[in-house]
Amino acid sequence: MTTTTTFKGVDPNSRNSSRVLRPPGGGSNFSLGFDEPTEQPVRKNKMASNIFGTPEENPPSWAKSAGGREDSESPGTQRSNSSEASSGDFLDLKGESDVHENVDTDFQASLAQVEEKPVPAAPVPSPVAPAPAPSRRNPPGGKSSLVLG
């Protein structure tokens, strides 16, 4: 004879039932068709539940290290973009403005030379003709039902 395991319902003193009626949280999951005031449990570590909302008061530690870099700098320090650094400009921290102007004029002169050169037009690629479809195609299994005489 085969026995089946049965589970208790919501009330532990009620008769045995084959359904599990109690949710993992322990509360009831019965819906009677009207809104009941329910209390949502407060989650301490919300990961991406409000990505468009206001930032959290206590972000996780990984968010502090990734997003906090810009905030951690003091307002007195100056930053330069990588494009500024590669163009030959530099920040004038010691008051050497005449050297900075010389670099600036040299840079503008080199830009003028670059602008005077005509840019060759990109060659237009010829349209690629699609491969011709074969006149006979085999079915996926490879076996053809074609009867040859």
Curated annotation (Swiss-Prot):
A GO-annotated cellular component: nucleus
Record's keyword annotation contains Acetylation: yes
Composition skew (Basic and acidic residues), residue ranges: 91-103
Modified residues (N-acetylmethionine): 1
Positions with biased composition (Polar residues): 1-19, 74-86
UniProt feature, compositional bias: Pro residues: 120-133
Keyword Protein biosynthesis set for record: no
Sequence segments annotated as region (Disordered): 1-149
Record keywords: Acetylation, Cytoplasm, Nucleus, Phosphoprotein
Residues found modified as N6-acetyllysine: 143
Phosphoserine, modified sites: 28, 31, 82-83, 87, 126
Annotated positions of the Phosphothreonine modification: 54
Modified residues annotated as N-acetylthreonine in this record: 2
Subcellular location: Nucleus; Cytoplasm
Stated role: Modulates negatively AKT-mediated GSK3B signaling. Induces CTNNB1 'Ser-33' phosphorylation and degradation through the suppression of the inhibitory 'Ser-9' phosphorylation of GSK3B, which represses the function of the APC:CTNNB1:GSK3B complex and the interaction with CDH1/E-cadherin in adherent junctions. Plays a role in the regulation of cell cycle and cell adhesion. Has an inhibitory role on AR-signaling pathway through the induction of receptor proteasomal degradation.
Subunit structure comment from the entry: Interacts with the complex composed, at least, of APC, CTNNB1 and GSK3B; the interaction takes place with the inactive form of GSK3B (phosphorylated at 'Ser-9').
Similarity comment: family membership: Belongs to the JUPITER family.
Protein name stated in the entry: Jupiter microtubule associated homolog 1
